[in-house]
A protein has these predicted regions:
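A short, polar/proline- and glycine-enriched secondary-structure boundary/capping micro-motif
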Residues: 70-75, 137-141
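N-terminal strand-loop-strand beta-hairpin
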Residues: 30-54
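N-terminal beta-strand motif that seeds the catalytic metal site of vicinal oxygen chelate
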Residues: 1-22, 78-85, 141-147
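Vicinal oxygen chelate
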Residues: 1-2, 16-23, 27, 50-51, 53-57, 75-147
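A short, acidic/glycine-rich surface segment
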Residues: 36-38, 67-71
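Amphipathic N-proximal alpha-helical interface segments
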Residues: 56-68, 129-134
Length: 147
């Protein structure tokens, strides 16, 4: 059975200490989080993140990291970082934003699987577009974790 999901997938919050943030959000909002995960970026660097088990939309905590992409660095400050959507055509969306989007996870033939718009592209907020298949797999993983 294929998982169902909504295009509005999650809200990303940038944090200094992901373990402490998961504990704080858990105690304050009554949320439970999946274990912290790491993911490779197109630069070869990694990022650390975790999703709430309640959703969609989910709350994603992302630990600050000074990567060469400059998306999650300490200069961004803690707080609301991005909103994320499932996208059936990430390469097309990337092209539509032109120089206002950065690929963070690549796919076959260099085609983008995950992109972030730059803050100036949409009134100071970043928008993350994730390949729909990735969102469906994540949704299924989180749904299974709550069983």
């Amino acid at each position: 059975m294929e998982a169902e999901y909504v295009p509005f997938f999650h809200v990303g919050v940038l944090v200094r200490d992901i373990g402490q943030a998961a504990e704080d959000f858990g105690q304050t909002l009554g949320l439970r989080f999946e274990p912290v995960r790491s993911a490779p970026l197109v630069t070869g660097e990694t990022m650390r993140f975790c999703y709430s088990l309640a959703g969609p939309p989910y709350l994603e905590l992302v630990q600050m990291a000074a990567t060469s992409l400059g998306i999650w660095g300490p200069e961004e400050g803690e707080g609301l970082h991005h909103i994320a959507f499932a996208d059936p055509d990430v390469p097309g969306t990337c092209a539509a934003f032109g120089g206002q989007a950065d690929t963070v996870v690549g796919g076959e033939g260099g085609s983008p699987r995950v992109i972030f718009t730059r803050p100036e592209a949409l009134h100071g907020i970043r928008v993350e577009y994730l390949q729909s298949a990735m969102v469906a797999a994540t949704f299924e993983r989180l749904r299974d974790a709550t069983r």
